[in-house]
A protein has these predicted regions:
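Beta-hairpin (beta-strand-turn-beta-strand) motif
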Residues: 14, 36-38, 65-66, 98
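N-terminal hydrophobic targeting segments
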Residues: 3, 131-134
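Short phosphate-binding loop-to-helix
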Residues: 1-34, 40-45
């Protein structure tokens, strides 16, 4: 189904997410929407919102939520970033301008704050599935 809809699938060595992603991005010369496959509520409307809201001048824009929003959904956030005296949680979604990535040097990350359950409810465990079924 994916290839029938012109979705490009990349095979990697499976070393780790960061190395695999960087190796793929070095080969591309366009904007890339990066997400994990465990966000079952991610839909076309929220993807369009993210793409429209991302700053095309930035190399890397990560979608984050406030920690308080995730806590209100009874989620236990793992990857937290702090700025402006607030705690935020990475969702695993990014918009990347791959044409600006030619090596594995550190890249300045821009943030897009979206407090929406479609970007933060993932399914990795039975407890995640049970929590998801309450929405």
């Amino acid at each position: 189904i994916l290839t029938e809809n012109n979705v490009v699938i990349f095979e990697t060595l499976g070393e780790n997410f960061v190395i695999d992603l960087n190796n793929i991005l070095k080969e591309l010369d366009d904007y890339v929407f990066v997400t994990s496959g465990d966000l079952p509520l991610l839909d076309g409307n929220i993807v369009k919102h993210i793409v429209d809201a991302a700053n095309s001048e930035k190399t890397w824009t990560s979608v984050i939520t406030t920690k308080s929003f995730q806590s209100s959904l009874n989620l236990i956030p793992e990857c937290i970033v702090s700025f402006n005296e607030e705690n935020y949680v990475h969702t695993g979604i990014s918009i990347v301008n791959a044409s600006k990535i030619k090596n594995m040097n550190s890249i300045k990350e821009d943030y897009l704050i979206i407090n929406d359950k479609r970007v933060c409810l993932n399914v990795n465990t039975n407890s995640d599935f049970k929590l998801l079924s309450t929405f």
